[in-house]
Amino acid sequence: MVRKHIFFSGDVQGVGFRYRSFYIAQSLGLAGWVENLWDGRVEMEVQGSEASIREMLDRIQQQRWINVTDMETVSYTHLTLPTKA
């Protein structure tokens, strides 16, 4: 399982990006959230298999009015919590 934090730039606000990405992610069994930012970008955090996340990103970029020009991605493969001594 992988968690990705992604910032999308381009024509990503006012074109149904959040709705379409939510629908696609849900259909692939992914979890997470997506929101518009004040600077015109969209921020997303998504969790699931690497293959499903890749499929979601491919499908988002195929949507009619969405034009992603840049994606900044941070991947998390596991989280380590500190233990009490």
Put a short name on every predicted segment.
Residues 31-47:
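Amphipathic, hydrophobic secondary-structure cores in small proteins
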